Amino acid sequence: MRNTFLEFEQPLAELENKIEQLRYVQADSAVDISDEIGRLQQKSQNLAKEIYGKLTPWQTALVARHPQRPYTLDYVREIFTDFHELHGDRMYADDQSIVGGLARFNGSACMVIGHQKGRDTKERAARNFGMPRPEGYRKALRLMRLAEKFRLPIFTFIDTPGAYPGIGAEERGQSEAIGRNLYAMAELKVPVICTVIGEGGSGGALAIAVGNAVLMLQYATYSVISPEGCASILWRSADKAPEAAEALAITAPRLKDLGLVDRVVNEPVGGAHRDPRVMARLLRRALGDALRQLQGLGPEQLVDQRLQRLMSYGRFQEVRA
């Protein structure tokens, strides 16, 4: 699949086009131009490092939404084995924007749950562009309860622009479903490890992100509202999205500094979509580290650790008059 380049990556796109053209020339002639191709590839690598070394928060948001970025099922295929998907909330329907099921991580049984956006138009429509309805969150909660019953660790993967705001979703109790998940996840007596792999959009993300450990990929985002939504409210114009992204502190390093995420998982040069397999290996290592740190804790200790983590959120500065 050809790489899709974002607007700020156009210098990279031009270099990649040159490399592609040279490959065609080499294939059709006896002239050896492999040295020139190698030089351009090195130049492309250096340029990618330069561009990605100084991304703005808004550019990071664009990378987090990249259409070729790995989704939950991509990581499931690379990191887990024996995945068996489970369907339905046992109350209304099966929401395909959230996927989940039993799997094995490093040979041990676990539960995997995550948002899924879809690759093509048909799949995106079926998965509602990764925006869950109430039945999606209720399915996730059902699987978490199942994992707790059998004492299985839970891995969740967050990648959603937000919960679906449609009339039907509201009629079926969208806010109740999200709130119940927050309440229930705080009291689960098994290890819960959450990873923001793309967009972490508000309550739609948080509903499967209450964990003992919260990881975040280097170019993922996590916020209470999208930059465009914030700009539309504050400045009455979505054109101010870059300014809003800066003010919202949506990037992984900022959120790590604020204590909202525990670990930032580095991505390959150019983002996870440039080398999904390398990204999966890096994430697998981080998930293994997080699970090892929690395996010595008993059920009550896991709950206490999770609650202490939640209670530590927020900062304030006392100023004397």
Swiss-Prot record:
GO terms for biological process: fatty acid biosynthetic process; malonyl-CoA biosynthetic process. It is an enzyme of class 2 (transferase). The keyword Ribonucleoprotein does not apply. It catalyses: N(6)-carboxybiotinyl-L-lysyl-[protein] + acetyl-CoA = N(6)-biotinyl-L-lysyl-[protein] + malonyl-CoA. Its EC number is 2.1.3.15. Keywords: ATP-binding, Cytoplasm, Fatty acid biosynthesis, Fatty acid metabolism, Lipid biosynthesis, Lipid metabolism, Nucleotide-binding, Transferase. It is found in: Cytoplasm. One of its GO terms (molecular function) is ATP binding. It comes from the Bacteria. GO terms for cellular component: acetyl-CoA carboxylase complex. Residues 39-293 form the CoA carboxyltransferase C-terminal domain. Pfam families: ACCA (PF03255). Pathway: Lipid metabolism; malonyl-CoA biosynthesis; malonyl-CoA from acetyl-CoA: step 1/1. Acetyl-CoA carboxylase is a heterohexamer composed of biotin carboxyl carrier protein (AccB), biotin carboxylase (AccC) and two subunits each of ACCase subunit alpha (AccA) and ACCase subunit beta (AccD). Belongs to the AccA family. Component of the acetyl coenzyme A carboxylase (ACC) complex. First, biotin carboxylase catalyzes the carboxylation of biotin on its carrier protein (BCCP) and then the CO(2) group is transferred by the carboxyltransferase to acetyl-CoA to form malonyl-CoA. This is Acetyl-coenzyme A carboxylase carboxyl transferase subunit alpha. It comes from Bordetella pertussis (strain Tohama I / ATCC BAA-589 / NCTC 13251).
